[in-house]
């Protein structure tokens, strides 16, 4: 984890990404007393985020809890997750709209707009490699317009806030006949005047296990 804007800090550690059906777990532990962990779990119905300190959650956890569709739609983790919605788009009752092509890391990708069945404040875009159709990126965006103040002077002082979460997937290799990414990056940014924030997490995945039973309690991560 690296704080690129809005502070200073960097940490290394171990991480686990697990899924079973629509349930998803993202668990990371860092060698930092100030930020020792990030633990997010979706039990198929509710999203949980464990505080990294009493009463304190990270900006990423706060954003995801405010936008649970990231997990309930099976989007987080991409093809690393058994909940990935493109495995059963009709069952999810979601829609995809083609939005042209875009270059990512020098490669042409197909850009798709993802529209959940239930309304969401997020704009969600999925990117597939145009040559091999690997899922290489998902972007989530939300813009909050500046509120109107009680007076013109107060209105001028208000500022728009823009949130953006980018998942990037790379280093595709075969695991148990499946082609899966072995590097997973999360980048979360908040754009606001005089107080920007940019956080970066990179997961280097070294071991894959399949058909391993996981108890429901493991996905309830708020404690």
Where are these regions (language model features)?
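A short, amphipathic edge element
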Residues: 86-98, 160-167
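Short Pro/Gly-enriched beta-strand edge/turn motifs at strand-loop
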Residues: 79-83, 93-96, 107, 149-155
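Gly/Pro-enriched, hydrophobic low-complexity segments
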Residues: 101-221
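A short, surface-exposed interaction/processing loop segment used at functional sites
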Residues: 46-59, 142-147, 217-219
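Acidic/charged, solvent-exposed loop-and-adjacent secondary-structure segments enriched in E/D, K/R, S/T
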Residues: 48-81
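N-terminal mature ectodomain segment of secretory-pathway/periplasmic proteins
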Residues: 1-56, 95-100
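Solvent-exposed loop/turn segments connecting transmembrane beta-strands
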Residues: 5-10, 78, 118-121
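Extracytoplasmic
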Residues: 21, 35, 91-93, 107-109, ...
